[in-house]
From Swiss-Prot:
Component of the 30S ribosomal translation pre-initiation complex which assembles on the 30S ribosome in the order IF-2 and IF-3, IF-1 and N-formylmethionyl-tRNA(fMet); mRNA recruitment can occur at any time during PIC assembly. One of the essential components for the initiation of protein synthesis. Stabilizes the binding of IF-2 and IF-3 on the 30S subunit to which N-formylmethionyl-tRNA(fMet) subsequently binds. Helps modulate mRNA selection, yielding the 30S pre-initiation complex (PIC). Upon addition of the 50S ribosomal subunit IF-1, IF-2 and IF-3 are released leaving the mature 70S translation initiation complex. Belongs to the IF-1 family. The keyword Iron does not apply. This is Translation initiation factor IF-1. Residues 1-72 form the S1-like domain.
Length: 73
């Protein structure tokens, strides 16, 4: 998936799931399943419920996404 095709939205983490997946609520109220991007996994960036994150969504499947950034609180 080329980066230019991805839709980036802000979200809030609702719960942590197994295998580095998270249920997040988008700013428009929808809930999607998101996993951590590779660079966040390599650098051990911790994500906890309640954190604000940036999520990339594919235009082909809007129910799944990738967490690419955690905002500093």
């Amino acid at each position: 998936m080329p980066k230019k095709d991805a839709i980036e939205v802000e979200a809030t983490v609702l719960e942590a799931l197994p295998s580095a997946a998270f249920r997040v609520q988008l700013s428009n109220g929808h809930e999607v399943l998101a996993h951590i991007s590779g660079k966040m996994r390599v650098h051990y960036i911790r994500i906890l419920p309640g954190d604000r994150v940036l999520v990339e969504l594919s235009p082909y499947d809007l129910t799944r996404g990738r967490v690419t950034y955690r905002f500093k609180s």
